Amino acid sequence: MSALSAEPELPGGTGWDEIVRVREETDAPEGSKVEIIEGVVTVSPPPSEEHNDTAELLHERLYDAIPSGCNWGIYQTLGLTCPETGSLFVPDLCVVPRAALRRGTSVHAGEAELVVEVTSRSNANHDRIKKAHGYAVAGVPFYLLLDAWQSGRPTATLYGEPQNGTYRVLASVEYGEELSLPAPFKLVLDTGIFPLS
């Protein structure tokens, strides 16, 4: 992973726009993920096969968990802005009202109903700490972290009740156990389906 520093607060209030411009102009290899994490443009390599498989398996199950009547989509490459922390995240999965994408403007992270990150060895701490903080600051109701690199024991952790930039742990299980997503999703997720890295 490489990082390009950018001043989060430039004179004249152009800080956020300048950071976003640097991100947009970053010439990253195909398949890489270019994000802004706390004012730093970060380029992550393409995810592994196991990483992609995990995201797809969850993606498939989330469709059945979306309440009827909700016009929500499940997205894999949607950029979510969080200028409050100088961040623009591209989560592995997010559930967002479709109307938020149709305005022609960027989507604020706080509009997401659920955000999912699947850790990679190279950037697990971003997912565990910086992104968790950013999503909590934005007010994302639920953050699901699928962490195959957690101290030798793959773990799925559901965070919720964001307050003052932090989440409360609602549930945490080792891969192989079931994890329940509460309303509005009402999904019992068998984490044994996820591949181990």
For each predicted feature, which ranges?
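Gly/Pro/Ser/Thr-rich low-complexity, intrinsically disordered segments predominantly at protein N-termini
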Residues: M1-A138, F142-S197
